[in-house]
Amino acid sequence: MRRYIVSIAMVLCFCLTFLTSCSYFMEDKIDEPRPKDPAPIQEDTIDSPIEGEEPEDRDDNEGDMGPVEEEPVEEPIEEEPPEDIVITISLAGDCTIGTDETFTYTNSFPDRLNKVGGDWKYFFAGVRDIFDNDDLTLVNLETTFTKATKKANKRFRFKGDPSYVNILKEGSIEMVNISNNHIYDYLQQGFDDTLETLDNAGLLYSGEGYKAFYESQGITMASLGYQGWNTDIKDQVKSDIEEVRDQADIVIVSFHWGIETKNYPNDVQLELGRFAIDAGADVVAGHHPHVIQGIDKYNGKYIVYSLGNFCFGGNRNPKDKDTFIFQNQFTFSDGELIDSHGIIIPCSISSRKDVNDYQPTVLEGEEAERVMNRILKYSSSLKYGIGNDT
């Protein structure tokens, strides 16, 4: 029994000795610093700064994956639609800027020019503001500008000195019709001189085979002119309209036609005017009767059968001095014609009632109403005649 106790004691003693040794060994291992592995060498992936250049500052927040603010989305700006374009064309009647050489009486056209001191602006002073504020003014040139002396064999032969062209220029007139029964009053020489004079003055002309083009506000206007004594010219009219139709936004056709002193159009006028519209014309201007006639609105387009006289040097005191300016306003939207509207401006060929002073003047009040009523009366007899709402 004693041997087991001793043996146990010896075993316990041995165990204690072993544990004490282990404890010391473990403490040694903890206190001893562990050698660090050498850090791996990383390759430089950023270019070295150029000599003399400061390296860029690094953003301390680089790589921060915090919330990103979204940039506000700008609403698309709606473009304003282009404004409509309104083209105003003024049409007026017979302008005899000169006289017959046999008219040597007091108050002939040349005599009046002398009395006003050669002032070119005098003759159209009463309507200049109207012509200044339109896009195009077109009148019938019922004369020649020439110094020729050889005349046609006829009763009245009109001419004016070539310098008289300044009257048209100072009147703010851009274009004239030359197809009429007086353009050859001084034969071929007179005709050639007239065209040369107009060219030198920068005035456009249409008729007798010539076509005129004029542009305003990006809109092109074409003008044609004819002596319309019969309907034999229909093929030529149609061909010419088709030719210029592809080049112009507005086509104007002038006819010198009808019977003098008659206030109603004849059958030729009615047929030719409506034919021109059917062929593609946008407005028809008529002259020759020397008095006013009615107006058709045919298929939405105007036929002015006679504008009457205007600045008329062919008579020092005609009994009927009534006339008018017809303005046709064309409205375009995105290059397309969307409306055609007519305006009648009643006038007198003279600023005086007792004599022709060759100064067309706008009428007012009762006189303007009287002329307007005449036009409406003559129009009422037409199949497509206008009313008060032209």
Regions found by a protein language model. Name each.
Residues 2-26:
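Sec-dependent N-terminal signal peptides of Gram-positive bacterial secreted proteins and lipoproteins
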Residues 22-37, 41-43, 47, 51, ...:
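Acidic, metal/ion-coordinating pockets
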